[in-house]
Every structure is written in structure tokens, then in C-alpha cells.
């Protein structure tokens, strides 16, 4: 019994070894757990996260700003020819019209040599102007535009209307010689007037309406349009107005087949998949800021994005336009 007691109280070496083994296993597990915990990554301090975010934002803004500036610069030195096709009921032979508007003293090449060369290569039958070749507030020196007119008049007959910037020079700066200078440079200026041209044995009537839609009843435009409406002795009638909203507000009540306008600079900013952003007449997301439209009288209205811009509102994602209209 004494031996049994001693055996129970003091286990044999095998039992001691078993107990130690169990104890050692637990210690090993405990050691692994402690070691794993010591290798865990420490959390990034909040100030570093804020700094990294700011650096990324600055980099993105720099890239965006650079792309924006590049786009603005491109739109000041490049333009595209936009081609339009319309059908006339009476023309016996097709004709081509080149429409320029809103140049705002801009030059493409020395003395606009690039623009003149492109117009010449298009071989137009008529060259029509939509106004705003000058810029009000930048003096009365527009000799470069007069030189352009002289060069264009050597290619084809040139006629057109004045824009709001010419009107402001004429009335506010008292530049009463403006119309005379345009005329001397080869432009037939239409101020609520008609001009007629014979192209390939077809008579083409050009109507030029002056001012803005608000002026229609006050300064002779309404009287002029009423006076020419009964005429039928022409093969094609084109109506010019600087402001495009003139057409849906007033002019679509009269007979013509093609309307041409500018003024909007294509909405200044053109948003992808949305279109023009803003015009003075229509506000945000305008309806008439560039492209082709069908009016209530079934005439086609073409609103050119124009060839220039004012220094206060540069174009963004909005390439200037030289309009080419083929009529058959």
C-alpha cells in the first residue's frame, strides 16, 4: 500500500514525460500565437492617408488642367469643315455655298491664308457671311477682316449680314464707315435687304435680316419680310440672320428653303453626349447652338459654330466650323 501511495503521488518517469510533453505542446502553441501577433502590420496613420489623397487629387487636377488648356489652345488655331446637304425643289443644277461667321478678328495663318486657301479649294458658287467678324471693345482696327473679304471676293460673290458686334461698333462707337468699308472690300451687306445671283442659270434670292428677334417689329425686319413674301420668281431662297432664335420666333413664318445663322459659338462649351452648354438667348442646354434643324415651314436651318470666339469665353470641346452647304 505504501508503494501504491508513493506511485500515485509521484508518478513514474513516463507519466512525468507525458505531463511535460503536454505542457510543452501548450507552450509551443502559446509561443506561435505570440510570434504571429508581433508580425501584424501597423495601421497607416490618418495624416498619411490624407496627404496621399491630396497628392492624388493634385495630380488629377494638374492632368485635367493641362488637357483643358491644350483643348482651348487647339480650338484657337484649328477649325473643321462641316458639310451639309439639302434638296431644292426648283434648282436645275446643284450649287455650293460656303458660310463663314463669328470670326472675331481671328486669323488662320498669316493674313488668313490658310482659311482663304481652304475656301478656294472648296470651289463655292456663293460665299455668305453671318456677322461678328469684329469684336466690340477691342478697338476699330479690323483691317485683317477687310483683307479677308477682298480675298474671298476673288473666289465667289460675297454677301452677308452684320452681327451684334458690328452693330455695337456702328451705333455705340459711332463707326459709321463700317458698312462702307465692308462694301469696298467686296461684301454686299444686307440690312433688311435682298440680293440676287444667277448660278448655273438658276436665280438665287438671298434675304438678310438685321438685328435680333426683339428688333423684328421695330426696325424694319417685319416690313421687309412681308414685302418679299409674295415673290416667286426665284429658284432658291436663302435667309440670313445672325441670331438663330430669330428663325423659330419669327422667320419660319415666311417662305425660304435654307436659313443660316451663327452667334452662339457652338454653345461655348460642348459636353460629351449632352451637347452645347449655354447661349445668351436660351440659357443652359440650348436648342439652337450648332447643327441642322427643320423649321415649321419645312426649311432647313443651319446654325454654324462659327470660326472664332471672344477672349472672355474660350471654346472647350468645341472646334470652330467652316460651313459647306451643297444644294441640289
What label would you give each PLM region?
Residues 244-323:
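Conserved beta-sheet core of the metallophosphoesterase superfamily
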